[in-house]
Structure formats: structure tokens, C-alpha cells
Amino acid sequence: MKNISAGHNALMVLGTSSGAGKSIITTAICRSLLRKGEVPIPFKGQNMSNNAWVDINNGEMAYSQAVQAWAAGIEPICAMNPVLLKPQGDCTSEVIHLGKSVGVVQAANYYEDWFSSGWEAIQKGLNDIATSYKKHRLILEGAGSPVEINLQHRDLTNLKLAKHLNAKCVLVADIERGGVFAQIIGTLALLKPDEKALIQGIIINRFRGDISLFEKGRQWIEEESKIPVLGIMPWLNEIFPPEDSLDLLERKHKKTKAEIQIAVIKLPSLSNFADLDPLEAEPTIQLNWIQPGDYLGNPNAVIIPGSKQTLKDLQSLQSSGLGNQIKEFASSGGTVFGICGGLQILGEKLEDPLGIEQSFLETSISELEGLSLIPIKTIFHSKKSLTKKDVISKWPDESRIMGFELHHGESTPTNSQKVKVKDLCNETSLGWVNEECNPIKAAGTYLHGIFDNGTWRRLWINQIRKKANLYELPLLEENHDAKREKVINRLTDVFEENINLEYLLKT
């Protein structure tokens, strides 16, 4: 591999822990450098997430790197996240190299089986970027903490990559979690001298209140570490979706102007929850995350999102009683919508003849009955569907919709004599609507990103509002990417007001 580090002035964002704010800071740096006329390229050697994006070549990458690419003003490509691990439960993960699935790994065997090929994928990703962008600056994001002593020998994306590229590193610490001084000094103390020399600055993230009150703390950190504190980022609530789906339970903010309550089922193996971001951004909608075992209540609508383990999650809904609550809600005329795995769960039957999902189940089951709200049958296949789509919806009304497929299995109508089903859009395999549940229909789609489409999203919302005797909202011509641009710019404005990025660029 040729030496790509010279002349590229790579910057790297490391964190004292998972959730410190590395993704957000990296996003802000990308947009800030774009404003300065540079060509920033986000890069995370290895990410672990079930929140995926499909790029223009139909390859999988982490959604957070896609957001960073948009912030950089460029098209997301899988080379920006060459290794993606998608947790499947039971200490196993699907391994994605440069957008393609290459196998499933047990955590205990990862280093032995996948470390070398993972590093090769990372080098290939770096070469692809160097070939595609002649003059650029790599903006690297680390993962978790760089000083997990028991894991350092198999750490592909922190210090190994930083040293490989001789990157200038900034260390981000989350003061909201408490113990920020121990986070910073403890992390630095565990670094080897050559590793510590890479740390050029420190950022304090998520500070609540008057930043000037932290001045003595800032001085102490600089004196103790001999590293400058580049700034203090204030608390920015819920800017982007967290990589860890468990963080969804911490979203307790209630909207004062919410008129519509939507129950989103937090499946145990929830994936692609960024599909719900456009609804989260609607000021009149409150999303309430409901887990198996919780009481569904009386929402205006229910959404079942994507799942990494559809059969296991279906079993969880059935055994907890939440599945019956959803069926009762639908039978009383409530709106139910499923996305990808959620669509499969809403069907009549799910068959797994090849045992694709058998390893996740306590007992071997080749088929399960779904919630039977949409008359379709799903058969799981080993081949994964990975395709970007641009189609016309037939329901709730005609509208152009764009998104992507990312799933195992094929669903087809069962031609039930009791229940009629119609296609959701002009491509017959992308989704269906149960025509019997009038006036609001149970429906579902394989199309991730469907709510990003502004007109379609408002059409869907307005049928719910009509049932609730609320006025219709105006249809939107702009899609969610316009809203995302505003959020990225807002984030970057705050970043530039509080963080001395110029210090890193000049040193």
C-alpha cells in the first residue's frame, strides 16, 4: 500500500468512552472545514452499529458516517467505513467489509478470524479515498475508548490507525456523565508516550449552564495534562440519533405542542432506527418508545421499525403480550405501520427453511405466525437485498418516494379470501396495505428512509390527524435532508463559536 499519510494532514477524534460525542464533533469538523474551502473526508475504520445506510453502489455503511459525508458536502461511500459490525445478539455480529457481508463472527474469535482481513479492508478504503479525492483532509473518528487495555491488541480504529496516518488527535470527554477529570487524565495516563504525543487538544462536551463556571477546571486540565483545552461544547439535546439503540430510552423530552402520539416498538434487536428521525423532527408528533412487557396505551398510531433478528423479536412480542395489544389496537381501527422487519412481523407467516435466523432462537423453529395484520408471507433467504429505490407511492396518495432496501427474505401476498391487500407503491415487492382496515389501514414497507420524503410523510400523518379530528398539515416539497442540513449548520455554528479548531489546523 502506498503511503497516503503524507500531505493529507489527518485529524482524528478520539473519546474517553462510548457516547462521548465523537460522531457529533466529527460531523461539525467536516462542515466547518467545508466552510473553509477544504475537502474533508470522514473515515471510521471500524464501526459497530445496526443503524446502516446503503451507498450509491448498494453497499452498507454506518449511518453516522453517511451523516458526516453529507456534512462534508460529498456523497457517502463505503470506503469511509470499511469495516461495519452489525450486532446480532448472543455475542455474534455480521461482518461487513467495504459494503459487503463477508460472514458472522463470535466476539471471542474476532481477533483470530477477522483482524487481518479487517485491516486490509481499512487500507483498501483509504486507498479508494486517496484515488477518488486527490486533495483532501481525512477526518477520522475513533470508537469507544482508545485505552481499553484488554482490547487494544484487536483495536483497528483508534491508536493503530492514528499512528499509521500520524494523525493529529483531539480527545473528547462527556462532562454530562460526571467524572470528566478522571476521564481525561485517566485516558492520557494509559497512553504510551508516542501515543500521547498524538493528542493535540481536548474538548469538553455537553456542558450545561454557564461555561465560564468551568474556567478553573479548564486550567487544571491544561496544567495537569500539558495539553490545551480547545473549547467546551454546550449541551445540544438530541441532534442526531445515538449509535447505541439503548440510548433511546434516555429520550425523555416531551414536546409541548405535540398533537399526535405515536408508539414506536423498541424491538430487542432494533435496527435502522434513524428511519424515525423525520417524525422526531415533526413538532406536532411525540414518539414514545415501547418495549415488550410495556403497556401500549392508546396512541394515535403504532410503528414497528426494522429488526436484526425478526423471528426472535416476533417471539418477544408474542410472549410479552405486546403483540396482542398491537392486534387489538389495529382491530379497533388504529393505524399500524411496519418498516422492513416490522413489515415482516405484521404479516401472516414467516418461514426460515434455511435456518438463517435459527441461531438466535432458544428452540429450533422453521416458521412462525406473524401478527396477521397484512396478508403476506415472508420466506428468509441467504442473499441480502441491498438496493436504492426511486418509486411512486399509491398510498396514501401518489407521491415520489426514495429510499433503500436492506433485508434478508422475500415477502409475497397470500391471496387471502378474507382480506384484500394492495401495493403501497408502483414497485410491487416494496410494501403492502391491508385494504380491510378502513378508514386507517395497516401497512408496511421494505423501504428504509420512507419518512425522509416530505410529501409522503405528511400524507401519512394527515390521515392520522383526520381520524383525530385535527386539521391537515400542509404538504412539504422539501425532504428530510433539508432539515438535516439546517441541523448540521446549527451544530457547526455552535461548534465554531466554542471550539478553537484553528489551533489544530496550524500546529
UniProtKB/Swiss-Prot annotation:
Keywords: Cobalamin biosynthesis, Glutamine amidotransferase
SUPFAM superfamilies: Class I glutamine amidotransferase-like, P-loop containing nucleoside triphosphate hydrolases
Domain of life: Bacteria
Chain ranges of the GATase cobBQ-type domain: 259-456
Residues annotated as catalytic: C340 (nucleophile), H448
Keyword match ATP-binding: no
Alphabetized GO MF terms: ABC-type vitamin B12 transporter activity; catalytic activity
GO terms of biological process kind: cobalamin biosynthetic process
Pathway entry: Cofactor biosynthesis; adenosylcobalamin biosynthesis
Role played: Catalyzes amidations at positions B, D, E, and G on adenosylcobyrinic A,C-diamide. NH(2) groups are provided by glutamine, and one molecule of ATP is hydrogenolyzed for each amidation.
Stated family: Belongs to the CobB/CobQ family. CobQ subfamily.
Protein name: Cobyric acid synthase
Organism: Prochlorococcus marinus (strain SARG / CCMP1375 / SS120)
Gene encoding the protein: cobQ
